[in-house]
């Protein structure tokens, strides 16, 4: 379990890093920030001075990259961010949660957790993809 404060501090560090230079930048990965915490603390909204956040720019029909069975809810625990106004941007139509028969559990639409015996599935999250252009 990772407290939301650790997430907020990580995003603050990203803001400090991007503010320290003027080069294009890309930040991506598993930020483990739930939609509930994002709404409560405006974490992604607070990044908008420096970053475009993929799931806020495109993928409007995407539910998320992770499904919480207990709460029956989807979250974007994973995302991709590109620096704002620095010659790098998303091709918004390319932003997507990557689902295939291989990484989706039966007909549920949920991630097929990786099975080390069969070598099938993904992690507990779906991959998140986007085409990025540099001008």
Question: Which sequence ranges carry the predicted segments?
Answer:
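Metal-dependent phosphoester-hydrolase catalytic domains
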Residues: 17-26, 33-135
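Soluble non-cytosolic domains of exported or imported proteins
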Residues: 1-9, 71-72, 120
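A long, amphipathic alpha-helix that forms part
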Residues: 3-23
């Amino acid at each position: 379990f990772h407290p939301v404060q650790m997430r907020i501090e990580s995003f603050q560090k990203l803001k400090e890093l991007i503010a320290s230079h003027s080069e294009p930048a890309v930040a991506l990965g598993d930020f483990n920030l739930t939609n509930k915490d994002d709404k409560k603390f405006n974490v992604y909204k607070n990044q908008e001075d420096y970053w475009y956040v993929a799931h806020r720019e495109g993928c409007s029909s995407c539910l998320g990259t992770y499904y919480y069975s207990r709460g029956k809810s989807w979250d974007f625990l994973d995302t991709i961010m590109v620096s704002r106004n620095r010659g790098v941007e998303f091709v918004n139509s390319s932003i997507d949660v990557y689902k295939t028969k291989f990484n989706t559990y039966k007909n549920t639409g949920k991630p097929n957790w990786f099975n080390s015996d069969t070598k099938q599935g993904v992690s507990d999250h779906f991959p998140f993809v986007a085409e990025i252009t540099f001008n």
